[in-house]
Curated annotation (Swiss-Prot):
The keyword rRNA processing does not apply. It comes from the Bacteria. GO terms for molecular function: GTP binding; GTPase activity; guanosine tetraphosphate binding; translation elongation factor activity. Gene3D superfamilies: 3.30.230.10, 3.30.70.240, Elongation Factor G (Translational Gtpase), domain 3, P-loop containing nucleotide triphosphate hydrolases, Translation factors. Coiled coil: none annotated. Residues 8-290 form the tr-type G domain. This is Elongation factor G 1.
Amino acid sequence: MARKTPIEHYRNIGICAHVDAGKTTTTERILFYTGLSHKIGEVHDGAATMDWMEQEQERGITITSAATTTFWRGMEAQFPEHRVNIIDTPGHVDFTIEVERSLRVLDGAVVVFCGSSGVEPQSETVWRQADKYHVPRMVFVNKMDRAGADFLRVVDQIKNRLGANPVPIQLNVGAEEDFRGVIDLIKMKMINWNDADQGMSFTYEDIPADMIDLAEEWRNHMIESAAEASEELMDKYLEEGELTEAEIKQALRTRTLNNEIVLATCGSAFKNKGVQAVLDAVIEFLPSPSDVPAIKGVDEKDNEIERHADDNEPFSALAFKIATDPFVGTLTFMRVYSGVVNSGDAVYNSVKEKKERFGRIVQMHANKREEIKEVRAGDIAAAIGLKDVTTGDTLCDQSHKVILERMEFPEPVIQIAVEPRSKADQEKMGIALGKLAAEDPSFRVETDDETGQTLISGMGELHLDIIVDRMKREFSVDCNVGKPQVAYRETIRGKAEVEGKFVRQSGGRGQYGHVWVKLEPSEPGEGFVFVDEIVGGVIPKEYISSVAKGIEEQMNSGVLAGYPVLDIKATLFDGSYHDVDSSEMAFKIAGSMAFKKGALEAQPVILEPMMNVEVTTPEDWMGDVVGDLNRRRGMIEGMDEGVAGLKIIRAQVPLSEMFGYATDLRSATQGRASYSMEFNEYAEVPKNFADKIIAERGY
């Protein structure tokens, strides 16, 4: 089959935002105007097409990023048909992992802000993640019909709080109840959408007389930003004072793709105003797969190689999401970076080093699906029938192996024990947890060796609530849930050189492993680093990886209170072996003995998760809120002015002090304050608290 849509006409975009900015409604309207969903779904009624898991419809927040394919030809059918793949991303703090995962496979993003509440803490997180993956983006300031909506104030916040360079290409006409439409600064016309047909039709009108000066001022700002794209344009602009519409668009596109500017548009998705203009901007200013740099990966020999968005290159794709579907089993969402693959073809999972076969390939539309015969470079689709693929694995052509970069996933910060209510639930719970863990790398399952309890850990209380809820709904598992526990960690602050010697002689073949290891802290966040400095074969090559394995396994339970150990550098520098008695097992045990001994000598400490907490409160209660955060061992980092005279307090607080905070804050401020919290880093626990933790663990 030939390619239906040229790759230049693809747009793979994400729609990202803070919780109530109206992202799902915006996506819904996009689906409506592109002709896919005939009745508009409202999140308030729990009926939005993109939010396809039951819990999302109940809670009215988006949890899983569903991928949807739509087609668009422009508000005035001015473009050839473009294929737009949309990934809807969650905006709740506990699901930051989903956002990270979807940004990884996108080419561009539309970031939605609320016209009245503007840039909120989670928006900053999403913005930083998009910076990390160099995703070109544009902004849609939504909810212009809300009380307190102010487009230019939000543009100002994007500049000052996010350090971005926003360039408005529209202005709003009226705001709050009087919001009527937008001014297109490129055409210098007002766009007026028709309320009678849900904004399907629109007219261009003259700009209201009282807005002409403001429109001229912002148009000049936009043209100056465009002229900075090249010296030729700047010279032309300085000489003639004007650029053509085509020149402006081309220049704004170039600068957006280079991540130099962020174009800003506005509207109200709920009131059906402005969404089609966002779609037009996606086509005109955001990249196609061939506009973004080739994806880098490594081949079998660890040499760096690139894969370009081209059907003629070998097949390569990244699995970015695993979802369990009650009807077809496991759906593996993938972004195809190069080549072509047909349903029924064999492919290779280069991370797991296993062959896989695509049973069927489906294109998703939120929760409906259409079977397709093949996928090509630039496509986003889901495969059915893959046996052992987890998030972040690479699928590729077997004779051209490549591993595309792995995604990094955060350490979970909160843990609860779950117990099945009956014998029948026991087995079902194991299966359910296994499937849920395959879908979500920020969720872990382990068994406590001492108590035999099953522990699940994740990114926050809501995250784990939803996991327990899904076990009940999707796998009908009833379980009792323990009290949330903090996921503490351990590390070392000092250095130690230690000997680990494992010798056993008792008739027949003995055991002999002997190592000298230097332990020291590695860089924060670097994890376990193993350095082999053995010279002259004092330990044979084949035993060295066993020493590393022994140390790494022992790091699962630390020496102070049995918590996993982070950020250790271990250097193996000496040792000895026995011709007959040495084995991999003996060296593994010697490695773990050395670690146990060394960790005790190298100033071991307990670490706790520190959270970035932002509290928004009326001024009257500010003193109480700050006092309460100080009592919770919080460090106040700063205060900002919020909207409508509210104050925003930023602090770092240990997670262990934040349980039940929502209730305490509500009662202290008569329900007027709100807060958000996300993981920042692991930090050392003060000595008196550490002693308490060690005593509680019975060490």
